[in-house]
Amino acid sequence: MNRSGISKKRPPPSNTPPPAGKHRATGDSTPSPAIGTLDDEFMMEEDVFLDETLLYGDEDEESLILRDIEERESRSSAWARPPLSPAYLSNSQSIIFQQLEIDSIIAESHKELLPGSSGQAPIIRMFGVTREGNSVCCFVHGFEPYFYIACPPGMGPDDISNFHQSLEGRMRESNKNAKVPKFVKRIEMVQKRSIMYYQQQKSQTFLKITVALPTMVASCRGILDRGLQIDGLGMKSFQTYESNILFVLRFMVDCDIVGGNWIEVPTGKYKKNARTLSYCQLEFHCLYSDLISHAAEGEYSKMAPFRVLSFDIECAGRKGHFPEAKHDPVIQIANLVTLQGEDHPFVRNVMTLKSCAPIVGVDVMSFETEREVLLAWRDLIRDVDPDIIIGYNICKFDLPYLIERAATLGIEEFPLLGRVKNSRVRVRDSTFSSRQQGIRESKETTIEGRFQFDLIQAIHRDHKLSSYSLNSVSAHFLSEQKEDVHHSIITDLQNGNAETRRRLAVYCLKDAYLPQRLLDKLMFIYNYVEMARVTGVPISFLLARGQSIKVLSQLLRKGKQKNLVLPNAKQSGSEQGTYEGATVLEARTGFYEKPIATLDFASLYPSIMMAYNLCYCTLVTPEDVRKLNLPPEHVTKTPSGETFVKQTLQKGILPEILEELLTARKRAKADLKEAKDPLEKAVLDGRQLALKISANSVYGFTGATVGQLPCLEISSSVTSYGRQMIEQTKKLVEDKFTTLGGYQYNAEVIYGDTDSVMVQFGVSDVEAAMTLGREAAEHISGTFIKPIKLEFEKVYFPYLLINKKRYAGLLWTNPQQFDKMDTKGIETVRRDNCLLVKNLVTESLNKILIDRDVPGAAENVKKTISDLLMNRIDLSLLVITKGLTKTGDDYEVKSAHGELAERMRKRDAATAPNVGDRVPYVIIKAAKGAKAYERSEDPIYVLQNNIPIDPNYYLENQISKPLLRIFEPVLKNASKELLHGSHTRSISITTPSNSGIMKFAKKQLSCVGCKVPISNGTLCASCKGREAELYCKNVSQVAELEEVFGRLWTQCQECQGSLHQDVLCTSRDCPIFYRRMKAQKDMAVARQQLDRWSF
């Protein structure tokens, strides 16, 4: 019914599925046609991500099923990739494709490409897509694994033959099951040079050892490390070089292939087998020497039309249990398939168990059995043939769940989801660990030929957020919330009717749609492909591995050009000791009401490495310093005491890599300014960001003591130069800008960080500070060796310097208007404080810095503290989140979030936080002297049981220190003014409903007016006669609470996409959820009071 009460029919649905987008490279793409919108009078906008949704009133279920059968027949052709061109079919055209996945397998040698070969051999497998959108599987033959050892002095051809025989014998003993005719295929004498340390001779003799299979490199290395008995030389152990390089990376380096680039195989250089091994449209075999690798420039910088599948599953769990694949069915799978670079998906469907009411613009596919649902999804994967599979937490939950569920049901044909025939999906537990990211537990699902991109993993790596739920991440990046239905309600919706299952389908589709939106918004595909191109590693390495593999890849490439080899580093952890970090000049804390100019070093650490030629191959050992007698003008002694040769003797590899990266970044930024096409801009922006990150990670690679090639002599030299430059900058500024030097005021450096200094020139206006800042940067840059450069970038005015690495100020880059309020190390940007602290600090800084109203800021703090003590603060503002980096038993000191996670595990192990998750909690009232870890509690549990919060904990442990840091420089007696006084004397504590001793308490009636205990009735004797006044007050209170609850309820309905369905959302990351729950409780209590009136 519409507002006027007249029933209106909704328009019938379209009989045709959404059109498939055109297949082309994204360099010149145009969006697919959008679905037409309908008049607002006909319907509410129910599905936020769709144009609209509707229910079909006139069609019975039988006609819907008949139409569905007709539509299914056309799906395969609508979903299929474009057909191969005649030139491809006749082998008369070179095959050019963008490779996305690259791995290696062990198989029989290709007799036609490698005549005379026999037995097993390593084969490189590359999957990709042509410009036309055809899928490619390329088998590359002939590339062999190898590594190096230094040739012992005096070893000749006969000795090498004896060495070969000894090594072959030991390898045969170690690899008894290998089906190869020869384990050590060749040992050759080659002229190379180790990258470690400066050497005057141009090269030395190495032995290149080529083995039959990649796994044999490690076993051969182990034999040589332990020692080998050689005729004529006795027992000898060897230092190996490049024996820890992954086979795929070795292949890419030697063939000059980088991740995500375009590969060409010329006509006549590839062979097609009659019996194909994959489902790809183009499958062929070639020799590695026939591959042409194209640099990512011009046409070859564009992206192929990759097919991106975003999916989500819903499972019907048992009451009180989180879904488990051994017991609980998969009831819905939502799928969106988009061509990379296009705005609209060309496949939009949801597969449901049992009937589901139609959804406009969505192909609803209903099935009677779970087996049919799972096989339909398997068929979709086969027909659509996605290159990239995305979702949110798919690696840890969705994909493993589907595989295990299919195994439980005995569906043997389900796990054939990859591009290789008869190859089943494999799932194993995995743990990712790095100093930057901490420890994260996950699962590794191998789907051969398809790149899995889990958005939760990418966002974890690239962004620091207080919560990583899909709802919270979507709110942060897309300003869009979603309904979050608790797993316990999903089963009820499934067991309802077609309408409730339709609601579940809309929810499931939203969970498939948001990851696609995030992928586009954060330009993940562009950024990751460009990072792979810049660093030379496969795209899949970027999510699965840390930073060091990227630098190692660049070192190997540059080393190959220079005929250098990398030693296999043996030291770990503490063997090399530690080094002193960067300098932070003493902070002259206070509130500065005059402009503060900031002078920043451009790419400081990379610049130092380039300026002073710091590298593995330019480092001179203390012994060689004495022995080589190098002229002083050709060496540099660093402030940390290390010696490096200058470029006049030898240019370092690391400085060369850095020069190329920074030059390429300048070029990419210049091209970005000129670019007009949005897709070209996305590629160039991704490239310049990748180049910047890569340049900055080179220094970290040398300082990682557990890395591939640590060298603390380099990293300690870099930081010592950095310290020296910060101190030199301070001296030069304060010596030059003085009244004696003709300036109006004496300049003062008030703070210096790793790569920047803050200067107060004494002038009162921003423009004058900017002029002096530019002059200072130019003057000081002239005293440093190029390319070290000091730049003037910004002015802070006013500026609140709290202490080291903690400050806030208004940032100006032009004198007319400030750009933003910039903070560092303050609770506005820290993620382990509750939202109340962040909001209060932000409000205070706004009033102090922007409004220049310190008394107003103080009054706002007092009011907030009073609200906290009187229990008037939303619970959502008091939630603290901390990352769970290990299990409770592994923590040396008990922590609030660690102990809560253990308690939640005892309540419900399935929904309890795991290692790597962030745990939300609040601190509750408890016995005097109880520790914080004993008082942490789950916010939902607190709401459900009306457990009182401990306001004093929040005042003393969360609010007081951040506030005093801000107010002490601007407010006299800040502690007394803000934390003591009349506003702190009244405290209200909630009575718990059913926890602790309250389980045994007997409730006592109290007077509605004055709250004194009474035996019956509504009012005490003293309040009799005030019935009208108190009743009206009670009615008014109920009406007010109903209005508050109604507004919150409507807000939640709008978020879920329907104004005529109950709200089911229980999102822990949404402040509205906590407010709605509290309003509902308050309203129920007020109604109980009202019901006590007997008239």
Swiss-Prot record:
It holds the Pfam family zf-C4pol. GO terms for molecular function: 4 iron, 4 sulfur cluster binding; DNA binding; DNA-directed DNA polymerase activity; exonuclease activity; nucleotide binding; zinc ion binding. InterPro entries: DNA-dir_DNA_pol_B, DNA-dir_DNA_pol_B_CS, DNA-dir_DNA_pol_B_exonuc, DNA-dir_DNA_pol_B_multi_dom, DNA/RNA_pol_sf, DNA_pol_B_thumb, DNA_pol_palm_dom_sf, DNA_pol_type-B. CDD domains: DNA_polB_delta_exo, POLBc_delta. GO terms for cellular component: delta DNA polymerase complex. SUPFAM superfamilies: DNA/RNA polymerases, Ribonuclease H-like. Its cofactor is [4Fe-4S] cluster. It catalyses: DNA(n) + a 2'-deoxyribonucleoside 5'-triphosphate = DNA(n+1) + diphosphate. Keywords: 4Fe-4S, DNA replication, DNA-binding, DNA-directed DNA polymerase, Exonuclease, Hydrolase, Iron, Iron-sulfur, Metal-binding, Nuclease, Nucleotidyltransferase, Nucleus, Transferase, Zinc, Zinc-finger. A motif (CysB motif) lies at residues 1052-1070. Residues 1-37 are annotated as: Disordered. It is an enzyme of class 2 (transferase). A zinc finger (CysA-type) spans 1007-1023. Its main location: nucleus. It is found in: Nucleus. Heterodimer with subunits of 125 kDa and 50 kDa. The 125 kDa subunit contains the polymerase active site and most likely the active site for the 3'-5' exonuclease activity. In eukaryotes there are five DNA polymerases: alpha, beta, gamma, delta, and epsilon which are responsible for different reactions of DNA synthesis. This polymerase possesses two enzymatic activities: DNA synthesis (polymerase) and an exonucleolytic activity that degrades single-stranded DNA in the 3'- to 5'-direction. Belongs to the DNA polymerase type-B family. This is DNA polymerase delta catalytic subunit. It comes from Arabidopsis thaliana (Mouse-ear cress). The gene is POLD1.
